[in-house]
Amino acid sequence: MSLTRLLIRDFRNIENADLALSPGFNFLVGANGSGKTSVLEAIYTLGHGRAFRSLQIGRVIRHEQESFVLHGRLQGEERETAIGLTKDKLGDSKVRIDGTDGHKVAELAHLMPMQLITPEGFTLLNGGPKYRRAFLDWGCFHNEVGFFTAWSNLKRLLKQRNAALRQVSRYEQLRPWDKELIPLAEQISTWRAEYSAGIAQDMADTCQQFLPEFSLTFSFQRGWEKETDYAEVLERSFERDRMLTYTAHGPHKADFRIRADGAPVEDTLSRGQLKLLMCALRLAQGEFLTRESGRRCLYLIDDFASELDDARRGLLASRLKATQSQVFVSAISAEHVLDMSDKNSKMFTVEKGKITD
């Protein structure tokens, strides 16, 4: 699907905007602080229920307003879908799909698979394991029907188990939680392992094109010892878990490690190379989704020119065009994106929250 229409009201510094969009490249050009990133963030929020620059809802709603409103129209091969999200200062959300309320944010995420590339996105490579788990879980969410329910139940059970660890004295008292937790943990770990194995060749091929000077390897670590049943690990770790008051092993501790020439990429690659690698991984995810399901990602790229020279920008632009996906790109100057433009592209100028084309 592509986003053909976007309405923004009281989001960040944007009072009101109604944008007719291209199914190909859409460029947002303006000075720092003009609001171009806010447009990208509005699209991201419409598909995720939360912003990517702040978790505090008060910072996202325009000054002295009570809520923001986002609406979009998604065009698929056979039908159009109307979607909407309203969120107030208390954090209460209302999701509307095709005119009916009561929907969940996860439904928006399923309708709008998107990849976000920002200057802060290096956390995928040099941040904690939670960022790489999120990378895997994005793929599992869009490829496995039961993943979201299983993942939600896992979070609930871990929270309950950790609370119980403060009160119990014997492992047998934890068995009611572990009876539910163990099969969920093993299923989620299996899905993650299958996804990481399935996408490995896509990542290798894309990374070879972007960073041919390095030999890159990828490894999935499930969060507990290899060749060991999770049930055995939980029982064996009981005393330590009770002392820590949290569950030290499991899928919530999984990681997905990337090495260049045998060393961690964060210790080996320059910032420009790290950005290229991040872009390669996001592209590989999108291409894998298209091959497996026929669905295309929507790409959001903030500050396109940062960290990349002309040759690398050209390579990224070429690969993005080859995906035939909808792409939104912000840049300080139109000169940075003119070579990506074609007859189907749209160029928007953003100034103090006002957007013109």
UniProtKB/Swiss-Prot annotation:
GO cellular component terms, A-Z: cytoplasm
Tree of life domain: Bacteria
PROSITE patterns recorded: RECF_1, RECF_2
InterPro entries according to UniProt: DNA-binding_RecF, DNA-binding_RecF_CS, P-loop_NTPase, RecF/RecN/SMC_N, RecF_2
Protein's UniProt keywords contain Nucleotide-binding: yes
GO molecular function: ATP binding; single-stranded DNA binding
Keywords per UniProt: ATP-binding, Cytoplasm, DNA damage, DNA repair, DNA replication, DNA-binding, Nucleotide-binding, SOS response
Primary localisation category: cytoplasm
Biological processes per GO annotation: DNA replication; DNA synthesis involved in DNA repair; double-strand break repair; SOS response
Residues engaged in binding ATP: 30-37
Presence of the UniProt keyword Secreted in the record: no
Pfam family name, one: SMC_N
Subcellular locations according to the entry: Cytoplasm
Family affiliation: Belongs to the RecF family.
Database matches in PANTHER family: DNA REPLICATION AND REPAIR PROTEIN RECF (PTHR32182:SF0)
Summary of the function given for this chain in its UniProt record: The RecF protein is involved in DNA metabolism; it is required for DNA replication and normal SOS inducibility. RecF binds preferentially to single-stranded, linear DNA. It also seems to bind ATP.
Entry protein name: DNA replication and repair protein RecF
Lineage, broadest ranks: Bacteria, Pseudomonadati, Pseudomonadota, Gammaproteobacteria, Enterobacterales
Gene: recF
